[in-house]
Amino acid sequence: FNLGSPKGFIFDELYYVDGAQDFLNFGVEVTGANPEFIAHPPLGKWLIAAGIAIFGDNEFGWRFATAVFGTLLILLIARLVHVLFYSPVLTALAAGLMAVDGLLLVHSRTALLDLFLTFFTLLGIYLWSRNRHWWAGFAFGLALGCKWSAIYFLAIIVLITLYRILVTHDIRETPRKIALVVTRYGLLPLTVYTLTWLGWFFSDRGWDRQSSSNPIIALINYHEEILSFHVGLTEKHPYQSHPLGWLVMLRPTSFFYDAPSGCGNAECAREVLAIGTPFLWWIGTIAIFFVVYRWIKSLRSRTTDNAANFVVIGLVAGYLPWFALPDRTMFTFYAIIIQPFLVVAIVYCAKLMLESRLNPLLSQSIVVGVFILIFICFLYFLPLFTGQLITYDQWQNRMWFSSWI
C-alpha cells in the first residue's frame, strides 16, 4: 500500500538502487566511466533491478522486490512453524506475528539487501530441515549472493550435519557422507555464489576486473578488498548501535525524517523508523531466553527439541557473530535476520501455554490477549513504519525513549 512513499531515496536506498540501475545499463556498477567499488555481492541489487525493469525507475519499482520477499517471508515462516509444531493455530499465530512486526514492514518497503538475505537464509534452513540438501545448498548460495553474513548460518548447518554423520552413520559410510556435505554445502553454494557475479565476469568495467588476466584471480583480488572494507568499517554514525541493544530496540535506525506542513497543526512530522514493534520484540526477548533455557535442558536430558534448536541456530549464527566486531559500525536494522527466530520463540512459548495445566479458556485468553496487545502496539506505531504525516506532538508521543530520536 502506497509503496512509492516517501518519495526519493531513503537511507541506503541511494547505493542499492543506483547499483541496480547500473546493472540494467552496464551489467556492473560504475561511477561515470570508472569502475565503482561495491562492498556487497550483486544478487540483491539484481532483484531490485528486476522491479525497476518491470515497473520503471521510480519508488514503486525500487521497492517492489523487497515487498514481494517480505510477503514470501511471512509464508515461509508459517510453513516452517507448521513443520515444527503441526498446529494450524500456531501456524496462523506465527504468520500474524510476522505481519505485525514493524521492522519487517519497514524492510519490506525499503530497497535494501537484508530482507533478501533473510529470506534465502531461512529458505536454506527450511530445506535443510526437510532433507532437501541440494536445494538447501542452492538457497544458501543465493543468500551469500545477497550478503556475506549468510556464511555464519551455512557454517552452523555444516557443523550440525557433520556431527550427525559422525555419531549416527557406519564408519564405512562416513567418507562418502562427508563428501556429499562438502559438495552440497561447499561446492554448490560457492558455484551459485560465483554465478551471481556473471555481470562482472561478462564486463570489462567492473572493479578489479583488469587486476589479472585470470578473471577468477581478479575476483579474488576484489573479495580481498571487500573483506578489508568490512573488517575496517569503523566510521561513526549517529544511528549506529551495539548488538546488545538490538533485541530490545534500544537504538532504532531512522531511515527518513521530514517536517512538512499539511497535518492540520503548526508542527508536523514524517518519519520512517526501522524499529520492531516494541511489545513484540520485548516479549520475544523474554521468550528467547526461555527457549534457550529449554534447549539447555534438552541437552542435559539428551532429548531432541527441534523448535528450540531452530531458535538457537538463529541466535548463534545471526546474532552472536556481531559481538566479535565491537568497533565495527553496526545498526539495529541488521536484526531483521533474527526476527523470524524471535517469532518462533514466541510461538514456542504460546504452545507451552496452550498445553499447560491451566484452564484451557484462561491459557487461550492469555495467548490471544498477548497477540491483541502486540497488534494494538503495531497500529500505534504504524505511522512511523510507513512514513505517514502526523503532528509533531503525535510523533513525540511515540518516542518512548530519548534513544529513539
Q: Whereabouts are the PLM-identified features?
A:
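Membrane-interface transmembrane helices that cradle and orient dolichyl/undecaprenyl
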Residues: V83-F85, G124-W135, L162-H169
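Transmembrane-helix signature of polytopic, membrane-embedded enzymes
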Residues: V68, I77-V100, H133-W135
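Specific aromatic-rich, kink-prone transmembrane helix
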Residues: L76, F116-W135, A139-F140, L342-A345
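Extracytosolic helix-loop segments that constitute the early lumenal/periplasmic catalytic or substrate-binding loops
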Residues: N2-G4, G8, E13-W46, A50-A53, ...
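Transmembrane helical bundles and short interhelical boundary loops of multi-pass, membrane-embedded
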Residues: L159, I165-L166, I171, R176-Y185, ...
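Transmembrane-helix motifs of polytopic, lipid-linked glycan transferases
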Residues: F60, F64-F85, L123, F290-R294
